Amino acid sequence: MCGICCVVALSSQHTICDYFSKDLHCHLRRRGPDSSQQLIKTVSEPSYECFFSGHVLHLRGLMTPQPLEDVNNNIFFWNGEIFNGVHVGDSENDTEVMFRHLALCSSEADILSLFSSLRGPWSFIYYQASGHSLWFGRDYFGRRSLLWQLSNVSDGAFCLTSVSVNSESCNQCQEVPASGIFKMDLRDCATTKSLSLTLFPWKYKCTEKNEEEIFIDVLDQVSKDLPNHITVVMNESKLCLSAPVIPLNRTISEASVEHVSSDSSKTSSVVSLETLQGYLAVEHKRKVVHQFIDVLDEAVKRRVLLLRRGEDEGTGQVQGVSPRKAHVAVLFSGGVDSMVIAALADRHVPLEEPIDLLNVAFMTKEQTKRTGTTKNCIRQEMKLDLHRGEENHKDLDAKMGDDLSCFDVPDRITGRAGLKELEALNPSRTWNFVEINVTLKELKEMRRRFINHLIYPLDTVLDDSIGCAIWFASRGEGYINKQGEMKPYKSPAKVVLTGIGADEQLAGYSRHRICFRKCGPEGLNKELEMELGRISSRNLGRDDRIIGDHGKEARFPFIDEDVVSFLNSLPISEKADLTLPRGVGEKLILRLGAKELGLEAASILPKRAVQFGSRIAKLESNNEKAYHTCSRLKLF
């Protein structure tokens, strides 16, 4: 995982400093703490200058500083993981492998073929010296962040970067659409003093749409938010990338339609394991569930094994913890998504290695109001502040149980229950349940210093709530229970697994029930297709920036290409049944899988969004809508 940045100045009136500030360098460096390197490429006739700044988090193979440059003056940035499609040896670094393959490409079609073959998250920037071309883009789902800052004047500079700075003085910043990959002819841009982007869009291998329809739709989508002087054109050869997944199966059985019309108004409120057992008694259903478990298991396996384990640098940074440190952590609420991921990770992470379960809670509002007079919560806030700034915690008061009651939010309660279920599943594993407690004071401070820059350019109340919760959770600083005492702990894991993608594909949100009631299974299919289509702009770039800020890498098993293709191959009736009550009907196939894995309690837990389960949504304001612009993210 890396922090990458490229600034191109097309005229002497604009300098690199217009875009690359000390603050931006700091944010990039936090993403890649293991290596930092900069490079400037100056070209005359026509005149332009390129500045490259690369920062590496070393996770696989040999340490490879970025940017890479070859004998032909080509320059390459890679922020990604190759999980399949192109062979990467155990001792190889995928950045070098990709650069080597790019050097062998002799045409645009070769480059598209290479990127079409990749499986895994990526964003990249590639300067092709011979043609003065700058290529860049994100994977099909946009699992790695890439932003562009485009000048408001036609002869200006522009910037591509993993993360930006939320500043009034900055040029407008947007997420690079995950609609395909882009190419810029820098020689032409410098000559005409204008910016023009050539797009190579994604296309399903089998689709009813012809190229012209695809091109029109994608161009409209990409162009709508760009300044008027910036043009986006389709490549002249009408070349496309091959989408790494199959289209959504929209098949709806007659039985499903009849079931909706007769039973949708009679949904029972009773949630029971017997309901799930009834489904599993049907041979076809059970077979599909096991196929799903198998494909998801492979996705988790790739994500927990493809990382450098080498020599241990110490332990989990607390006395008395397992002598081996954790390399893998899970964003953990105890809900069915995170429970299944943790259980599957347990199959593949070496047994002697702990797994960190990161559980975040925000101080309940009632306690926040009383912090001026309530000794327990004042003392707790002081201890949390000490915990953030001090390395030596040996003398910390062990009698913290009473004080921590103000963090007993819903996700903390379900998280503890989930821990017990995992411990029963594998008592030989060290499960570090990390209780991450956040006060209002610390929330405001960390939002001001870091989080508002990472959420940017997104700006809604929902982005703020989710972004803050994920930032504190993935930081991994909290407490673990050792022999009945709460001990300070900081997770050393560099890989963070997250369950995002399950709700989007398996009708997990409450809005899906509303859609189903209004429009039936046809409407639900359209909604789910839209969910996955917009996940790059709504979720994944933001989450990558948030988690990457700690020098850690987000990995998304539910958005593995094989998992998505498998789920897309199934009709909606195999994945969810929204005539059933909450806690069963949504994400039905996942709940059935959880029961088969032995996670019975988790299998019938209703969906609870992180902003509600962690209680951040109630900490600062109760009168906001999720889609409102968040005033707390604005600069003052």
UniProtKB/Swiss-Prot annotation:
Gene3D superfamilies: Glutamine Phosphoribosylpyrophosphate, subunit 1, domain 1, HUPs. The active site is at residue 2. GO terms for molecular function: asparagine synthase (glutamine-hydrolyzing) activity. GO terms for biological process: asparagine biosynthetic process. Signal peptide: none annotated. The keyword Cell division does not apply. Pfam families: Asn_synthase (PF00733). Residues 2-187 form the Glutamine amidotransferase type-2 domain. Keywords: Amino-acid biosynthesis, Asparagine biosynthesis, Glutamine amidotransferase. The keyword Amino-acid biosynthesis applies. SUPFAM superfamilies: Adenine nucleotide alpha hydrolases-like, N-terminal nucleophile aminohydrolases (Ntn hydrolases). It comes from the Eukaryota. InterPro entries: Asn_synthase, Asn_synthetase_domain, GATase_2_dom, Ntn_hydrolases_N, Rossmann-like_a/b/a_fold. Residues 291-607 form the Asparagine synthetase domain. This is Asparagine synthetase domain-containing protein 1. It comes from Gallus gallus (Chicken). The gene is ASNSD1.
